[in-house]
Design a protein with these regions (language model features):
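Non-catalytic C-terminal accessory region of glycerolipid acyltransferases
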Residues: 2-28, 123-251
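Short hydrophobic helices that act as membrane-entry/anchoring signals
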Residues: 30-48, 104, 108
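A generic local structural motif
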Residues: 39-40, 51-57, 76-78, 125-127, ...
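Helix-to-loop junction immediately C-terminal to a conserved catalytic motif
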Residues: 40-72
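Short, basic, glycine/proline-bearing loop/turn elements
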Residues: 40-43, 109-115, 142-146
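Short, well-ordered coil/turn elements that cap or connect secondary structure elements
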Residues: 47-49, 86, 104-109, 165, ...
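A conditional alpha-helix N-cap/helix-loop micro-motif detector
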Residues: 50, 118-122, 152
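Catalytic core of membrane glycerolipid acyltransferases/transacylases, capturing the structured
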Residues: 62-119, 127
Length: 251
């Protein structure tokens, strides 16, 4: 079944945000993106030092379409991708972050676009599909919001929708330690070890367990691939999920 999505602008009258989000075809980064990336990288390395352990970003495919899907534990998580993610990444960000016109303008320059987490935001989905149709690389957090515990929450079905509809390759990413570095409700970070691990890029198989291939089943499959990258204490609802034995790998 094909889902009809509106072709309207990405958002309604957010001060500082362009009426139509500029999705670029050439993979270049704006000066705002470069400046924020440098700030993120310098801040994280300066504060956490060798405690910040990241897999080689050379595992990122140079071209899309690519869905980069990660579990979400802390507000530090997007900073890591902003500072160390190679090339240009696009990212869905909660609409509340765009309440300030200046912040909204900066986020737009960093390839971030708003999503309303309280509803099925079709405009955000349309923008995400536009990014992927132009062979872009889109970062999305699996659970849609920060987990209140280290263990993974169930994936949002929208992740499965984007994977199915776009046909993009998928890069699973696992992060842990950020929940201790900047817990929910805290304003100042703590110096603790942080680990980010990249999994192998894969494509959706033709069949899923039980013959299911709906949005939630696809999202759960991606969740199980992320869980494989995490220590057992962080796998949450995916601790006992059976993963298909073989998924066609692109790497």
């Amino acid at each position: 079944m094909r889902h009809a999505l509106p072709s309207a602008s990405v958002t309604d009258e957010i001060p500082g945000f362009p009426e139509r989000f500029p999705v670029r075809d050439d993979g270049t980064r704006s000066w705002r993106y470069k400046a924020v990336s440098l700030l993120c990288r310098a801040s994280l390395r300066g504060f956490f030092g060798r405690g910040l352990q990241l897999d080689s970003m050379s595992k990122f495919p140079a071209e899309g379409p690519l869905l980069v899907v990660c579990n979400h534990l802390s507000n530090i998580d997007p900073w890591i991708f902003g500072g160390f993610g190679p090339g240009a990444l696009y990212c869905m960000s909660k609409r509340e972050l765009f309440s300030n016109p200046v912040v909204s303008w900066i986020l737009a320059g960093c390839n971030c676009f708003p999503v309303d987490r309280g509803a099925a935001d079709r405009r955000a989905l349309r923008t995400a599909l536009d990014v992927l149709s132009r062979r872009g690389r889109l970062l999305i957090f699996l659970e849609g919001t920060r987990s209140s515990t280290p263990g993974m929450r169930r994936a949002e079905a929208g992740v499965g929708f984007l994977a199915r509809r776009s046909g993009a390759s998928i890069l699973p990413v696992g992060v842990w330690g950020t929940e201790a570095a900047l817990p929910r409700g805290h304003r100042l970070p703590r110096r603790v070890p942080i680990r980010l691990k990249l999994g192998p890029v894969f494509e959706l198989p033709e069949r899923l367990p039980g013959e299911r291939r709906d949005d939630q089943a696809v999202a759960d499959l991606i969740g199980s691939r992320i869980a494989e990258l995490l220590p057992p204490a962080y796998r949450g609802v995916y601790a006992a999920v059976d993963t298909p034995a073989a998924i066609p790998s692109l790497r």
